[in-house]
Regions:
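Conserved, helical-rich catalytic subdomain that frames metal- and/or nucleotide-binding sites
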Residues: 221, 226-294
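Gly/Ser/Thr-rich beta-alpha loop segments that engage phosphate groups in nucleotides
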Residues: 14, 24, 177-183, 215, ...
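Glycine/threonine-rich beta-strand-loop-alpha-helix active-site module
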Residues: 198-238
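ATP-binding N-lobe of GHMP and related small-molecule kinases
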Residues: 1-174, 194-199, 203, 251-254
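Short clusters of hydrophobic/aromatic residues that line enzyme substrate/ligand-binding pockets
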Residues: 26, 139-141, 174, 178, ...
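DPxDG-like acidic metal-binding loop motif
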Residues: 176-202, 218
Length: 294
């Protein structure tokens, strides 16, 4: 199964208060945005992948699977290739090549990466999940900790899932507040629900999604929603944006961690006395370019 994910926009964001669990209570309007998205393929272990050959060819590795001549972890890759074909395999540690040692790379066990870092592949310790992630700008995270892998694992806690292979090509900007990773997780949940015949409705899927990330549940419904709580409490909202052209500007090479962004916020309850926090009551500052229009 191959799906194209999308991202989301927040049309307004009000940070109300910091919670005891470390999250923030917010109010926001989520709307889907189809200008950006990733390509996700999920197949059972013995199915043929239409994505793998294209990914490996595009990112410099041979079609099919990794090869010792192009991959930093060398002598155990045949085990990765065999994984999921006949069911779970024994966990195996991947050794690092001399070139990789020179670069000081620190590969987790069971994870292989291309020399240029644009493609990584990992297999879970029980051998039931193989995940491959490709990104033009490089993949600097453990694929087994990606939200797609976490989506598989959270369903596997309650259901007897078959071994699967996940192929993900990251094209949506990372660290841009667009929810690309959350979308990948939500679409993984929906795909596994269909592939494995789990019979979960959107409400049940959203409950799983909310455990993976604050805005993951939105992508289960993928329509305009008012988000509250930490973003997982959703209420449908009718809005027609067809007459508007929304431009999304993303500075090249700039990525902001959501957690870091929230750490720098003073919630509404922390505003100085007398200060307005409503957008409609904001006044332009003298140095603001719009001051002459106010």
């Amino acid at each position: 199964m191959i799906v194209k994910t999308n991202v989301k926009l927040n049309l307004g964001l009000s940070v109300l208060r910091k919670r005891a669990d470390g999250f923030h209570d917010i109010e926001t309007l989520f709307v889907p945005c189809y200008d950006f998205g990733d390509t996700l393929e999920i197949i059972t272990g013995d199915d043929y992948s239409r994505t793998s050959a294209a990914l490996f060819a595009k990112y410099g590795a041979p079609a099919g699977h990794f090869d010792a001549s192009t991959i930093s972890a060398t002598d155990k890759l045949s085990d990765l290739q065999k994984a999921l074909v006949g069911g779970p395999v024994e966990p195996t540690e991947l050794s690092k090549s001399a070139k990789d040692e020179e670069k000081g790379a620190d590969l987790p066990g069971n994870v292989a990466a291309s020399y240029d870092g644009r493609l990584v592949q990992g297999i879970s310790e029980d051998g039931k999940l193989m995940i491959t992630i490709a990104r033009e700008e490089g993949v600097d995270w453990d694929p087994l900790k990606d939200l797609c892998a976490k989506a598989y694992n959270i369903l596997a806690q309650d259901f007897d899932l078959p071994p699967v292979k996940i192929f993900l090509e990251k094209e949506a900007p990372v660290g841009a507040g667009l929810g690309g990773g959350s979308a990948d997780a939500a679409f993984t949940l929906k795909a596994l629900n269909e592939l494995c015949g789990l019979g979960l409705d959107d409400q049940r899927l959203s409950e799983y999604a909310s455990k993976l990330g604050s805005d993951c549940a939105f992508f289960i419904f993928n329509r305009p929603m008012i988000g509250s709580g930490r973003g997982e409490v959703l209420e449908p909202y009718d809005i027609n944006l067809s007459e508007y052209e929304i431009k999304v500007l993303i500075p090249e090479g700039v990525a902001v961690s959501t957690a870091e962004a929230y750490r720098g916020i003073v919630p509404r309850e922390g505003l100085p006395s007398g200060r307005s926090d409503r957008l409609g009551e904001q006044k332009c500052l003298p140095e603001d370019p719009c001051a002459s229009e106010c």
